[in-house]
A protein has these predicted regions:
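Juxtamembrane/disordered regions of integral membrane proteins
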Residues: 1-144
Length: 144
């Protein structure tokens, strides 16, 4: 980030847009092994985004604004990464694994529905974590 962007109005939104684009790619790559990795990385990503947004705008809410703008891009990339992995694994394998874990028969269609529901929950957790950590990082950076 250049020196001319420090303290300018709208800087947190710009940072959020940039980090949202980066987050889409990062989210996709880190979620290929599974959604849990995407949830964990969302915290680190939110911290970086919040600090940069706070430097860009120097307002108390800049971390929150940057995180809220970046979160949808990260969530979309993360969800796409998990979907790609699930399609490679296949619904039959997911159903077999769920059947073994739950001790009951799960059809491929039911397994796919459970998987999609888990993606929605994962995306919500990622958004909450990313925005919360980004807000805290922004406040912490402005406090220094």
């Amino acid at each position: 980030m250049g020196m001319d962007e420090r303290g300018e109005p709208g800087g947190a939104v710009k940072v959020g847009m940039i980090w949202g684009g980066i987050g889409g790619v990062v989210g996709l790559l880190v979620s290929l092994p599974g959604s849990l990795v995407g949830i964990v990385v969302a915290g680190f990503f939110g911290f970086s985004c919040g600090r940069r947004a706070a430097v860009a705008e120097r307002r108390a809410l800049s971390g929150l604004i940057g995180g809220a703008v970046a979160a949808p891009g990260y969530m979309l990339g993360s969800t796409l990464g998990a979907l790609l992995t699930a399609r490679l694994i296949g619904t039959a394998e997911i159903a077999a694994t769920l059947s073994d874990v739950l001790g009951t028969q799960v059809s491929a269609d039911e397994a796919w529905i459970y998987f999609l529901f888990s993606l929605v929950l994962s995306a919500m957790f990622e958004a909450v974590i990313l925005i919360s950590v980004s807000s805290a990082a922004g406040a912490w950076t402005n406090k220094e």
